[in-house]
Amino acid sequence: MNIRQAKTSDAAAIAPLFNQYREFYRQASDLQGAEAFLKARLENHESVILIAEENGEFIGFTQLYPTFSSVSMKRIYILNDLFVVPHARTKGAGGRLLSAAKDYAGQNGAKCLTLQTEHHNRKARSLYEQNGYEEDTGFVHYCLNVPAK
């Protein structure tokens, strides 16, 4: 298994995995939209995508979004997406992607990686905790949906 940073030319091959990831979160299938979204993020250097590849097949990915902490005056990466295809979930790809994300963040001067997952997603929560992530009980997170104008 090889973990590497995605290039813009990988967007079409990552799109089916990204589409499955979105479907897990109850979004309608949109393969064309998935590819366009990924391509735009990569072209505009708005995210970093790390991919797990085995025998020429993409079996997983994680997507990191850069942001900053005003308090610490340091970079933070938001690990927004992590997905491994079902037939490869026992091969350690998720852990290897998390390790690669940690290495990438460290090499780029980040203070930390943050992420969120659904409360009921016990498998993901267990994986994150096995890889050193701790639930942040010191802060409350809010979300405001903004209507399009």
UniProtKB/Swiss-Prot annotation:
PROSITE patterns: GNAT. It is an enzyme of class 2 (transferase). Its EC number is 2.3.1.-. GO terms for molecular function: acyltransferase activity, transferring groups other than amino-acyl groups. SUPFAM superfamilies: Acyl-CoA N-acyltransferases (Nat). Residues 1-149 form the N-acetyltransferase domain. Keywords: Acyltransferase, Transferase. The keyword Heme does not apply. Belongs to the acetyltransferase family. PANTHER family: AMINOALKYLPHOSPHONATE N-ACETYLTRANSFERASE-RELATED, AMINOALKYLPHOSPHONATE N-ACETYLTRANSFERASE-RELATED-RELATED. This is Uncharacterized N-acetyltransferase YhfO. It comes from Bacillus subtilis (strain 168).
